[in-house]
């Protein structure tokens, strides 16, 4: 009887890094992010990121009514890692990170792009896994994109591990 209760109880939640995680929450996050979330993934990041999918873009915005790219990175970092980032993508690139190559990106690293003036950082997202990152697109709101898409591949500046 004790084994049966343990088995049933273990079907609903898991303890990772000192947190109880509901598998239904992870399943919903995986559906919204459109990829599998594995045992070794950064669950708090994946869950928080998934809650922002579909939020409209708003320049200078930092809430669920509208958010821009640096507002998204700043808000998710504050929520998940209790870390404050600067308010714009260029400042985040210059002051908040240690540069990381595309090949060495890990979940939670920031990814920087030049979408305007050539070579100048003007867009930022958060790397999730397997080439996927979350960001606030000015035309589509908060979405997950792939670093291997031509636009992002051609405009990628650097990754960054937050200091």
Q: Predicted segment positions?
A:
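Catalytic cysteine-centered active-site loop
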Residues: 32-33, 55-107
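Extracytoplasmic/secreted envelope proteins and their assembly/folding machinery
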Residues: 42-46, 50, 70-74, 105, ...
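Aromatic- and glycine-rich peptidoglycan recognition patches
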Residues: 12-26, 32-37, 99-100, 117, ...
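Structural motif
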Residues: 108-110, 131
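C-terminal motif of bacterial Sec signal peptides marking the signal peptidase cleavage site
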Residues: 7-10
């Amino acid at each position: 009887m004790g084994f049966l209760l343990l088995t049933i109880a273990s079907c609903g939640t898991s303890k990772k890094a000192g947190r109880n995680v509901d598998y239904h929450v992870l399943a919903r996050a995986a559906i919204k992010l459109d990829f599998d979330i594995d045992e070794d993934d950064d669950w708090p990041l994946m869950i928080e990121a998934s809650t922002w999918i579909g939020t409209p873009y708003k320049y200078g915005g930092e809430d669920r009514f509208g958010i821009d790219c640096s507002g998204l990175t700043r808000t998710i970092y504050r929520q998940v890692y209790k870390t404050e980032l600067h308010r714009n993508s260029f400042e985040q690139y210059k002051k908040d990170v240690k540069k990381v190559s595309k090949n060495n990106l890990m979940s939670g690293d920031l990814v920087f792009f030049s979408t305007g003036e050539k070579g100048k950082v003007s867009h930022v997202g958060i790397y999730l896994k397997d080439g996927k990152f979350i960001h606030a697109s000015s035309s589509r709101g908060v979405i997950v994109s792939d670093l291997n898409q031509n636009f992002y591949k051609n405009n990628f500046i650097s990754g960054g591990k937050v200091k």
